UniProtKB/Swiss-Prot annotation:
The name this protein goes by in its record: CUB and peptidase domain-containing protein 1
Residues at the catalytic site: 65 (charge relay system), 116 (charge relay system), 212 (charge relay system)
Signal peptide feature range: 1-16
Organism: Acropora millepora (Staghorn coral)
GO BP annotations, alphabetical order: proteolysis
Any Pfam family the entry gives: CUB
PROSITE patterns named among the record's database cross-references: CUB, TRYPSIN_DOM, TRYPSIN_HIS, TRYPSIN_SER
Keywords: Disulfide bond, Hydrolase, Protease, Secreted, Serine protease, Signal
InterPro entries named among the record's database cross-references: CUB_dom (IPR000859), Peptidase_S1_PA (IPR009003), Peptidase_S1_PA_chymotrypsin (IPR043504), Peptidase_S1A (IPR001314), Sperma_CUB_dom_sf (IPR035914), Trypsin_dom (IPR001254), TRYPSIN_HIS (IPR018114), TRYPSIN_SER (IPR033116)
Top-level taxon of the source organism: Eukaryota
Disulfide bond residue pairs: 50-66, 151-218, 182-197, 208-237, 322-341
Subcellular location field: Secreted
Predominant place of localization: secreted
Amino acid sequence: SGFHLSFSFFRRAVCGIRPTLSGFIVGGTVAPINSWPWQAKLRIAGNFLCGGSLIQPEWVLTAAHCVEGESPSIIKVTLGAHYLSTAQVVGTEQYFDVVQIIQHENYKMPKRFSNDVALLKLSRPAALRNGVGLVCLSDDQFQRPFNGTSCWTTGWGRLSWPGPVAKELMQVDLPLVSPQNCLSSYPNGYDPNTMICAGRSQGGTGACRGDSGGPLVCEFKGKWYLEGVTSWGQLPCDLPNKPTVYADVRKLKSWITGKISRSPALKVATNCSSVLNNTLKSPGYPDSYPINMFCVYRVPIPCDTELVIHFNSFHLENHVFCWYDRLRITDGSNRVIGTYCGQQTGRSVLVNDTVAVLTFKTDRSLNSSGFHLSFSFFPRGNATLLPFTTPTQTTTQRPTTTPTPGCGVVQNNTLRSPGYPSNYPRNTHCVYRVF
């Protein structure tokens, strides 16, 4: 019968490369946009939590004290970001759920912040492109610059103590401090086996509250290496002879690489359904879908064609952030088009790329009837989105449905919000791409 092959192309993962440039950052400057491509931003329940560093396409390294006792389902990771606020974007952002937290088993032993590292496994590999890249792990072949050569730390932490957090990513260059001097500064808290220090003896610069988990990087032979993970320091954050203390990545490298190599790959469930006749139904539909599902569906889109996904029926466990059960739609570049849960029957979603990737994930508790989707292909620029009916309820009358337009498309170089000039509907997520 011969063979049927498919070809996928991926950029080779190269670490430590940043653009050529002409916890808490005190006394630093605003970083040029996308100048530190491994910088991660962690949020919990919608609020900024900590920084982190992308060390593998699926792995972010952060501080253990940032995620201690937290569930992976409530932590969100953003890569390629510059602004602290999620309302301000630069266009290179990639958004991720966390599926696993691996905290160092000896965190807080023997000192309070010993072994202050944790690994976050992302829900999918990051796309290594504009503004998103890997940092190299510290390498023993390079001698550390304890002679005063500066390294750099970055973050959205406080600009002073007490003081506000940064609205944009900040950077500051700091010299590494020898273990002897660090021990002199912190005779009771410093652990030379798991910590490294950086800062100026005169003070005035350093990391602060909100920078925790972020990177301390040094350049060797044209590449940037992660030497430290921002951990702790003395308040206020800019005291003389009180450097910032970081988890020592070089000392902890074997733990980091060992945990990553032993972590099982995210497995796709064997009982996932299939796309048949341009239709996709969740496993078990119309009965309840199983718990603990992880299914990935790839829908190729022919050249000069765009895809409309119509939600004929859609009922998943609801949550304001879709933390529990969800369907996520991304394009071929890992750009998130939308994340959906709750009741979404009647919605239409436009995908204008070479492929649509649908990821269906469920948790271990409540479930619902699932979804029934249909796929329609149109010549590029000619897609029609069906109206999306949003249920509304009042306490005085029977629930009614109010038709509102779908997301629509750009036509004649014009784009109108759904419902314009009337009010746009609530709980709407629209993505428009202008080529």
